[in-house]
Design a protein with these regions (language model features):
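Flexible glycine-rich surface loops and low-complexity tracts that mediate binding to linear polymers
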Residues: 4, 9, 84-105
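Non-Sec secretion/translocation targeting segments of pathogen effectors
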Residues: 65-66, 104-114
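Beta-strand/loop nucleic-acid-binding surfaces
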Residues: 68-86
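Acidic, low-complexity, intrinsically disordered interaction modules
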Residues: 57, 61-72
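Structural detector for short beta-strands of small beta-barrel domains
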Residues: 27-60, 89-94
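A general sequence property marking short-to-moderate contiguous segments
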Residues: 5-42
Length: 114
């Protein structure tokens, strides 16, 4: 089943595709998730040998979805001792098959300001 996350106007809408139409499954507050369309069905399975830094987009009973760069990664919900907060910028690591999420360190960015 194709599933996507639509974030706009402060709302987070979980949709699934049925016969070419997108139907709403759940509508809730977006919180800290940035506006956009996130195709959850295109998510790749998380590499358990790497540390993955990014924003937690969505969590359901089976999976936790995280945006890493421009890609979406899917973690198994059962691997987490405690599921991370939606919208939080988290660093997910695996140790002995269990996933641990902690707040990712802020990256310093050099920019111009006036």
């Amino acid at each position: 089943m194709k599933q996507r996350l639509l974030v706009m106007n402060g709302q987070k809408i979980v949709q699934h595709e049925q016969e070419g139409l997108w139907l709403n499954d759940k509508v809730e507050k977006a919180g800290l998730v940035k506006p956009g369309i996130y195709n959850l069905y295109l998510a790749s399975q998380a590499d358990k040998t790497k540390t993955l830094d990014g924003v937690i987009l969505h969590a359901d009973k089976d999976s936790v979805f995280q945006q890493v760069g421009k890609n979406v990664v899917k973690h198994d919900r059962a691997d987490f001792v405690k599921a991370p907060a939606i919208g939080s910028h988290s660093s997910v690591t695996y140790d002995q098959g269990k996933a641990f999420a902690r707040a990712a360190p802020e990256k310093l960015v050099r920019g111009m300001s006036r």
